[in-house]
Amino acid sequence: MATINQLVRKPRAKKVEKSNVPALEACPQKRGVCTRVYTTTPKKPNSALRKVCRVRLTNGFEVTSYIGGEGHNLQEHSVILIRGGRVKDLPGVRYHTVRGALDCSGVKDRKQSRSKYGVKRPKA
């Protein structure tokens, strides 16, 4: 335990909190251009072909972003919006593509959790 005199001379150092999404630079979303759209396999014990894309952001960062939902229309040079949120079984993927924003379409025939996949309310 430090004495009061020691604390007067040298105050306690503040702990620096490390961000999980450094490329966003404290913004809720960032815009970027797809440089590569591909599939990758998850860690054990899962098995699938996860859709991901490499994105060059407006601030110069190049990150990998996960494309959620069934089917997508992304290709190279598509302009997309990314948000934070990692994918637990894909190492190095710390961002999600926002569906239904910019060049990324919403998920076709989606009925539930529509707001997360950029789908408008169906007509009655």
UniProtKB/Swiss-Prot annotation:
- What Gene Ontology molecular-function terms does this entry list? rRNA binding; structural constituent of ribosome; tRNA binding
InterPro entries associated with the record: NA-bd_OB-fold, Ribosomal_uS12, Ribosomal_uS12_bac
Give the UniProt keywords, A-Z.
Methylation, Ribonucleoprotein, Ribosomal protein, RNA-binding, rRNA-binding, tRNA-binding
Q: Which residues carry this modification: 3-methylthioaspartic acid?
A: 89
UniProt keyword Cytoplasm, yes or no: no
Which Pfam families does this entry report, sorted A to Z?
A: Ribosom_S12_S23 (PF00164)
- Which GO cellular component terms are attached? small ribosomal subunit
CDD domains on file: Ribosomal_S12 (cd03368)
One example of a Gene Ontology biological process annotation: translation
Q: Which PANTHER family match?
A: 30S RIBOSOMAL PROTEIN S12 FAMILY MEMBER
The UniProt similarity line reads: Belongs to the universal ribosomal protein uS12 family.
Q: What does this protein do?
A: With S4 and S5 plays an important role in translational accuracy.
Quaternary form?
A: Part of the 30S ribosomal subunit. Contacts proteins S8 and S17. May interact with IF1 in the 30S initiation complex.
Q: Can you say what this protein is called?
A: Small ribosomal subunit protein uS12
